């Protein structure tokens, strides 16, 4: 399980010139309990799931553990849904490079990302 509370004022309320402003985006999926969190600067992805029942079903799991750009190059990434509610395209809007990824509630073996050529 992954938990990283934002308890630093500078991250919770970044200045307009900060690298954290507009960096992260949350996308709703067709599953009302699951969201995709995108770091739009480097392409990292997390599956975020919540529950109104208990804290045991709250989690944030990486789909893509590695940055998809080199040398801390700032890019703008976006995602687009595919026909399956579990699969999306991840697109580097600067270069046009694309990846296909899948989220899942079944476990890590069903969560993946691959370069689309």
Stretches found by the model and what they are:
Residues 25-30, 79-83:
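Structural signature of eukaryotic scaffold interfaces centered on beta-propeller domains
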Residues 42-47, 54-55, 95-100, 107-108:
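Short loop/beta submotifs within extracellular cysteine-rich repeat domains
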Residues 9, 35, 46, 50, ...:
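Tyrosine-centered aromatic motifs in long, intrinsically disordered, low-complexity repeat arrays
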Residues 1-7:
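Hydrophobic membrane-insertion alpha-helices, especially the h-region
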Residues 25-27, 36-40, 46:
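Solvent-exposed interaction surfaces and binding hotspots enriched for charged
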Residues 33-40, 87-93:
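Short beta-strand motif characteristic of blades in beta-propeller domains
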Residues 65-103:
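Short, solvent-exposed interaction modules
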